Amino acid sequence: SATTPTTEMTGAPTDAPTQPTESQNLLDDTIIELVNNDDVAVHIMNIENNEHTGMQLRIQCENRTDRALMFSWDMVSVCGYMYDPMWAEEVAGGKTVNSTVYLDTYALEQMGITSVDEITFTLNVIDSENWMETLLKESFTIYPTGLDASTWQVPQRETPDAQVMADDENVRFVIEWADGEDTSKFTMYVYMENKTDRNLMYSWDMVSVNGYMIDPFWAVSVAAGKRACSEITFYGSDLEANGIEEVSDVEFTLLVSDYDDWEADYLLEETYTYNP
């Protein structure tokens, strides 16, 4: 389970959610300590929320070793939904970097998230020259708006036209809608739930459109107990090459596997047909 980090403060944090102004530091005078050991120290120095651009987490990473290290976030979720901020920093031996993790307002709103009440992530620190050597791999949960584990809620999705393709004790996979208005591509918007205590990988195999094999090269990882929204795109050039002017059916084999154990059996391996 994720660790709740330590806080260092000169002013008491509020118990109630912070209502963001155009831009403000949600931590006030608080510094969140994620890790502090002989090798590394990582602190969240402040969290700024801008109503137009999104949330920015200012992070300080200190490398106390004599070799270059790579700091990164993995398996990131915001309010229960997977979100990849694409953050990583390489820090030379004995040096410190001040960096920023950005959470985009538009991307979060597409998932139904209007307030970033909870963020869970795995902090990885590895040797830059030897990626097999891990100095740190630990999960953390922070609550930027002052809520806690008992008060924040996962935003629920309302998609009346959605087609539920798979729903069992382990996974849920839903095609919410498809957009064929843009002649340059055909995009399917999908939603997934991981109901297990393992990290899972969702992918499509043996995909055909109107009976013609076209591979969208799609795969998404979903952390244990989390949800995800994603887009699956077929490009106009591929459709045109197969003489497809309008998509009438998409057939695919949905594969759900253990993200951390590639030799494990599939949790799901089933073929479905979607009719837009």
Describe each model-derived feature in a short phrase:
Residues 16-32, 123-164, 267:
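A eukaryote-biased signal for short, well-structured alpha-helical docking elements
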Residues 24-51, 151-182:
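Low-complexity, acidic Ser/Thr/Pro/Gly-rich terminal tails and inter-domain linkers that flank the onset
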Residues 60-66, 191-197:
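Asparagine-centered strand-capping/turn motif at beta-strand->loop junctions
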Residues 61, 75-76, 103, 192, ...:
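Hydrophobic beta-strand positions in extracellular immunoglobulin-like domains
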Residues 67-74, 198-206:
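Short, hydrophobic/aromatic beta-strand segments
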